[in-house]
């Protein structure tokens, strides 16, 4: 490996670095040597992670050599150990004036990133270097525990208490082996990520969680998610020592948000009620046991249950605290506008004082709550929700985290809480409070509860806390930190070292365009007053239709928010824009839930990889999962469209208070401290979200792509200045849409000719965990190559379950049977099922009165997303199941068989998920309730039984909604309403769900009778100008007995040459009919100018913009080719090819010269529209 010398440090690097990489490593070393903080931005694909690791570890080795040289010098009495290498050259890293003396002075490196998947990628990069430090990766029990008795529980806090109980009693065989295995050299000297730790733990029968904590003591580099550092409770729980450590935050664009959220909370009425109920249940049991005692002499409270070491009075005190806290919160009268009440941060202590919780009582209160939680969590029998009680205990610790045991009033209300606000507002959730008959069980069951919010508005609060721990330095780095000035202001700590690195790509690899107006001339905007205007949404749809034609392979489209995306897609479906996009690039929509994300993204990847497809389009939101961590390298992201500026919700109380806080800080103007104004922060939030979405494309040095900013507000200098520094030089604003289309088509033609084709990995090689690996931030080395997935088409069927209105027309015509099944699977939204099968599982049998078609129809909208999320159909598991054959095998032959096969599996898959998520007792309880419902047909009894175990934990709400598929038709509406009351979300009920199977059959039979039979052979109706596998409409309009039968409207077959003069008359008539008189006048003015000036560029930009607003007008553009002069025809033909994707769209020489055609056309115009050609139309 090459050795590069930077600032006196020899850095081993895997290859010769680029100048931008050397600059980056120099800045890192400068921070380490001078003990100063740094903020470093380097675009994805520039090898940021590799540079960070190599420079940091090289400096650490040099630091260690400094100590070695000093010790040897002392022993040698000043003599040189090697004549040709003076000891002064061994290590002179201490340029900060310090002279390290002991090896214990060597700083630990704490490397934090947002998620474990990103940390896994970093660890894999470390394996590619020559450095072999001792490392450990810290994770939660959720990721690392291998004890099945603990992992079978639903809630994370229950797993924590179960684990602690087993550890304290030494009943966990895996924990008992930790001491022995933690010194194993094979483990200590290996570089293990989370997955490797789990594999090692299972193989060696040692607990990975406690093994990682043991390895931490002697590790040189400690990897962890950055909430472990920023959350004081987590930092204390993991015993993270920060003094003298180097702290690195990778992917730091989220640090600002995490800093605020780690010290904030929202306490809802539901949390308090569930906490009171849990303590009340225990109190009743203990009181009952006392009453059963034979005599007072024989009574011993602790002997009632050896697991609970507290008396009944302590339990009663805890309950009283909870009730007093609930009363204190709910006693506030809300203002008429229902906006809530805001208090200073110090008010939180007054509020808790009302419940007798203060700095003196906090410790015993928290210990009592955690002991109760631990006891209830480990108790066998019916599950009792203790999440609310655990949350209250965590909140008390958070509020009093900085308070000493004997804290004074002054310390509580001092200047340190200026960053916090207390906000009390009505609970507007759909959670319906359960009525409690015991008057002592809740103090406010008759009134709507209030939510207590305690919000931090300064990320600098957490950053300053890290500095108080005496860290050596803090380095923040990411691919998108721009604008840097506002970012550093928010952190409120000094950053003497900063860097905005350029990209390693060349000019011909990036195309950036600000699109102010759509092809129809309507200004594009997602401002609050414009976002849902029909003309605006239509223009945006037309823009995307055109871009989908010229951008090859994968196209990414980002919306400002989910509501904007949902309403826009609904409009496009109703008006036909979505169908036109589908014809070129099948649409895949980012789901809100986590469960189906892998399914949808795999479908998108598979469609892009399909050699018979023109690619796919992926619709997502800024700040969503796809915009944050997904890799769309190479063909998966050739273009990214930003449909607007994603400003935060302006009237949200937290946003309003944040802006007020910043404005207040600016007015007070503390010397030496710079604050953003509220408006600057508001704009920065939108800019940073845009920059993060832009970063999804151009992921390595050979990648290329286009960025389209589709909002007129991007034209402002302020908006452009907040774009990443590597993007700003290439931004171009176009006056005409047609000119932009021409340039981007030329850009991709050039790039495809000059850039190497991405290396596609084989099916076996690139198949495993493809979706998970793309969640990692690949491209950390500029040698990154894309990983191509295998074709996984059947998963894409769920892509639009998340937008209720997006349901594609049923493809039940015989003409579709010859179409490629895989392509149809990717674009289908809804399908009719016709094959009848016997019930294949118990749950199928329970609802034998409802056929499988109804099951598919009942799961619509958000409910289908929730249902699928419970199936946990991870990529590997699906592959394994399908490879076994039998009834689980999906044979992609024709659509009906595939859908039937999938639906037959849903009952069994749901049953498996129910069994996996619930305890054995609760699963058995629900199955008995379903059997009873089958025989008694009593919905109330069913709900009374199944609701209790399924509504306690938010994670199991989707299971309650998932049972909707087994509810009989006459109960579906009521069940949907009850689910809405209990979980805040319905099941997607539609009126047709209440129809019985017989009623549905009758409706279907009547609709079949009403259908018009084909009047001509199918071959006569097919339009050969569009490939059938592109998913578009393809049947034309036919005449029958003088009347018109509209089968499926479609444009005429394009003509490539016009040999007769009179054809110009027909062309003129067709154009005027298609685009109207005004636009026809504009077009022929441009053609007349072309005839006289021979200015092809000016003519084509006008003509293309006018004739690409609708799909059917493309044929007219092709017919205009006869008017193009010979020297321009090749160029015009390439433009047509890029717009249509049709190789046959080649401009032929006509028998009549183009000048003659233009003259003839002018004559026709003069004859029809007097007085002159220029005043035509």
From Swiss-Prot:
A Pfam match: Helicase_C_2
Record's subcellular location: Nucleus
Keywords per UniProt: 4Fe-4S, ATP-binding, DNA damage, DNA repair, DNA-binding, Helicase, Hydrolase, Iron, Iron-sulfur, Isomerase, Metal-binding, Nucleotide-binding, Nucleus
Keyword Isomerase tagged: yes
Keyword Hydrolase: yes
Motif DEAH box per record, residues: 250-253
SUPFAM superfamilies xrefs: P-loop containing nucleoside triphosphate hydrolases
Domain Helicase ATP-binding residue range list: 7-302
Chain intervals for the UniProt region annotation (Disordered): 847-869
EC annotation from Swiss-Prot or TrEMBL: 5.6.2.-
Molecular function terms, GO-annotated: 4 iron, 4 sulfur cluster binding; ATP binding; ATP hydrolysis activity; DNA binding; DNA helicase activity; DNA polymerase binding; metal ion binding
Annotated positions binding ATP: 42-49
Basic and acidic residues bias (residue ranges): 852-866
Record: residues binding [4Fe-4S] cluster: 145, 163, 172, 207
Reaction(s) the record says it catalyses: ATP + H2O = ADP + phosphate + H(+)
InterPro entries, alphabetized: ATP-dep_Helicase_C, DinG/Rad3-like, Helic_SF1/SF2_ATP-bd_DinG/Rad3, Helicase-like_DEXD_c2, Helicase_ATP-bd, HHD_RTEL1, P-loop_NTPase, RAD3-like_helicase_DEAD
Similarity section: Belongs to the helicase family. RAD3/XPD subfamily.
NCBIfam families: rad3 (TIGR00604)
Protein role: A probable ATP-dependent DNA helicase implicated in telomere-length regulation, DNA repair and the maintenance of genomic stability. Acts as an anti-recombinase to counteract toxic recombination and limit crossover during meiosis. Regulates meiotic recombination and crossover homeostasis by physically dissociating strand invasion events and thereby promotes noncrossover repair by meiotic synthesis dependent strand annealing (SDSA) as well as disassembly of D loop recombination intermediates.
Protein name according to UniProt: Regulator of telomere elongation helicase 1
Gene responsible for this protein: rtel1
């Amino acid at each position: 490996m090459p050795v590069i010398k930077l600032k006196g440090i020899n850095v081993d690097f895997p290859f010769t670095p680029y100048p931008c990489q050397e600059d980056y490593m120099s800045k890192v070393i400068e921070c380490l040597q001078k003990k100063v903080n740094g903020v470093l931005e380097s675009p994805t694909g520039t090898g940021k992670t590799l540079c960070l690791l190599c420079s940091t570890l090289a400096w650490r080795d040099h630091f260690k050599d400094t100590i070695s040289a000093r010790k040897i010098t002392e022993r040698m009495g000043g003599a040189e150990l090697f004549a040709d290498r003076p000891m002064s050259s061994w290590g002179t890293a201490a340029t900060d004036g310090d002279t390290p003396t002991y090896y214990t002075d060597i700083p630990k490196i704490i490397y934090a990133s947002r998620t474990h998947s990103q940390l896994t990628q970093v660890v894999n990069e470390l394996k590619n270097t020559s450095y072999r430090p001792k490392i450990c990766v810290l994770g939660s029990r959720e990721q690392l525990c291998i004890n099945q008795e603990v992992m079978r529980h639903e809630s994370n806090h229950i797993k924590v208490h179960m684990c602690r109980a087993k550890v304290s009693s030494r009943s966990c065989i895996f924990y008992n082996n930790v001491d022995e295995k933690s010194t194993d050299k094979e483990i200590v000297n290996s570089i293990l990520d989370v997955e490797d730790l789990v594999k090692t733990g299972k193989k060696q029968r040692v607990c990975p969680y406690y093994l990682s904590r043991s390895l931490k003591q002697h590790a040189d580099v400690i990897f962890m998610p950055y909430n472990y550092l920023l959350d004081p409770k987590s930092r204390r729980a993991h015993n993270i020592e920060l003094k003298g450590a180097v702290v690195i935050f990778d992917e730091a664009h989220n640090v600002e948000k995490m800093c605020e959220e780690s010290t904030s909370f929202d306490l809802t009425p539901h949390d308090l009620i569930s906490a009171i109920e849990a303590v009340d249940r225990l109190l009743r049991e203990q009181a009952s046991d006392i009453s059963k005692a034979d005599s007072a002499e024989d009574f011993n409270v602790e002997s009632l249950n050896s697991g609970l070491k507290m008396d009944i009075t302590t339990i009663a005190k805890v309950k009283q605290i909870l009730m007093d806290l609930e009363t204190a919160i709910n006693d506030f009268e809300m203002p008429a506008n229902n906006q809530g009440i805001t208090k200073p941060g110090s008010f939180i202590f007054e509020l808790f004082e009302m419940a007798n919780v203060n700095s003196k009582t906090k410790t015993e209160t928290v210990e009592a709550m955690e002991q109760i939680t631990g006891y209830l969590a480990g108790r066998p029998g019916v599950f009792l929700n203790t999440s609310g009680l655990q949350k209250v205990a965590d909140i008390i610790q958070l509020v009093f985290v900085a308070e000493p045991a004997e804290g004074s009033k002054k310390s509580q209300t001092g200047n340190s809480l200026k960053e916090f606000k207390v906000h009390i507002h009505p609970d507007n959730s759909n959670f319906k409070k359960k009525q409690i008959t015991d008057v002592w069980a809740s103090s406010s069951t008759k009134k709507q509860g209030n939510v207590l919010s305690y919000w931090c508005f300064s990320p600098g609060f957490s950053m300053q806390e890290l500095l108080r721990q005496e860290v050596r330095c803090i380095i923040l780095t990411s691919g998108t930190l721009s604008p840097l000035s506002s970012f550093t202001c928010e952190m409120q700590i000094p950053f003497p070292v900063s860097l905005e690195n350029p990209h390693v790509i060349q000019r011909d690899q990036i195309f950036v365009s600000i699109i102010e107006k759509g092809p129809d001339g309507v200004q594009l905007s997602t401002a609050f007053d414009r976002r849902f205007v029909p003309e605006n949404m239509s223009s945006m749809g037309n823009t995307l239709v055109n871009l989908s034609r010229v951008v090859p392979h994968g196209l990414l489209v980002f919306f400002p928010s989910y509501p904007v995306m949902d309403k826009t897609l609904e409009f496009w479906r109703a008006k036909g824009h979505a169908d036109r996009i589908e014809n070129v690039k099948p649409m895949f929509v980012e789901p809100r839930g986590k469960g189906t994300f892998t399914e949808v993204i795999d479908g998108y990847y598979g469609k892009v990889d399909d050699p018979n497809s023109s690619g796919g389009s992926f619709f997502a939101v800024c700040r969503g999962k796809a915009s944050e961590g997904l890799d769309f390298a190479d063909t998966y992201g050739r273009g990214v469209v930003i449909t607007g500026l994603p400003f935060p919700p302006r009237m949200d109380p937290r946003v309003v208070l944040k802006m007020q806080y910043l404005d207040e800080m600016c007015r007070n103007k503390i010397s030496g401290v710079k604050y953003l104004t509220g408006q600057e922060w508001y704009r920065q939030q939108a800019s940073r979200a845009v920059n993060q979405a832009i970063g999804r494309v151009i992921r390595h040095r050979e990648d290329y792509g286009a960025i389209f900013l589709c909002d007129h507000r991007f034209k402002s200098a302020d908006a452009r200045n907040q774009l990443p520094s590597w993007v700003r030089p290439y931004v171009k604003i176009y006056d005409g849409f047609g000119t932009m289309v021409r340039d981007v088509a030329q850009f991709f033609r050039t790039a495809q000719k000059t850039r190497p084709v991405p290396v596609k990995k084989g099916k076996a090689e690139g198949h495993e965990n493809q979706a998970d690996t793309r969640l990692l931030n690949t491209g950390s080395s500029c040698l990154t190559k894309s990983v191509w997935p295998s074709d996984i088409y059947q998963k894409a069927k769920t892509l639009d379950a998340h937008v209720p209105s997006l349901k594609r027309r049923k493809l039940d015509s015989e003409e579709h049977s010859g179409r490629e099944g895989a392509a149809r699977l990717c674009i289908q939204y809804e399908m009719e099922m016709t094959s009848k099968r016997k019930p294949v599982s118990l749950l199928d049998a329970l609802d034998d009165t409802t056929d499988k078609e109804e099951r598919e129809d009942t799961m619509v909208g958000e409910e289908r997303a929730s249902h699928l999320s419970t199936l946990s159909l991870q990529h590997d598991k699906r592959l394994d199941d399908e490879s076994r054959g039998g009834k689980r095998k999906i044979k992609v032959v024709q659509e009906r068989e595939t859908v039937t096969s999938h639906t037959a599996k849903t009952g069994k898959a749901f049953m498996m998920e129910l069994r996996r998520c619930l305890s054995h007792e609760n699963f058995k309880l629900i199955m008995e309730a379903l059997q009873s419902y089958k025989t008694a047909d009593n919905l109330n009894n069913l709900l009374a039984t199944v609701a209790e175990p399924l509504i306690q934990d938010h994670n199991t709400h989707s299971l309650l909604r998932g049972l909707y598929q087994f509810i009989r038709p006459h109960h579906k509406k009521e069940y949907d309403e009850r689910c809405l009351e209990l979980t805040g979300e319905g099941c997607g009920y539609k009126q047709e769900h209440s129809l019985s199977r017989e009623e549905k059959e009758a409706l279907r039979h009547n609709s079949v009778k009403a259908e018009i039979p084909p009047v001509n052979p199918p071959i006569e109706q097919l339009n050969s100008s569009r490939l059938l596998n592109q998913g578009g409409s393809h049947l034309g309009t036919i005449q029958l007995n003088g009347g018109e039968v509209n089968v499926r409207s479609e444009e005429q077959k394009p003509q490539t040459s016009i040999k007769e003069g009179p054809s110009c008359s027909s062309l003129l008539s067709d154009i005027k009919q298609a685009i109207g008189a005004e636009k026809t006048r504009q077009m022929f003015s441009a053609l007349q100018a072309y005839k006289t000036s021979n200015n092809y560029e000016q003519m084509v930009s006008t003509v293309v913009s006018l004739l690409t607003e609708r799909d059917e007008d493309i044929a007219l553009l092709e017919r205009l080719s006869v008017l193009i002069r010979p020297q321009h025809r090749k160029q015009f033909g390439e433009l047509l090819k890029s717009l249509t994707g049709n190789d046959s769209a080649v401009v032929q020489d006509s028998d009549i010269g183009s000048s003659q055609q233009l003259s003839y056309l002018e004559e026709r115009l003069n004859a029809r529209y007097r007085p002159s050609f220029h005043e035509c139309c």
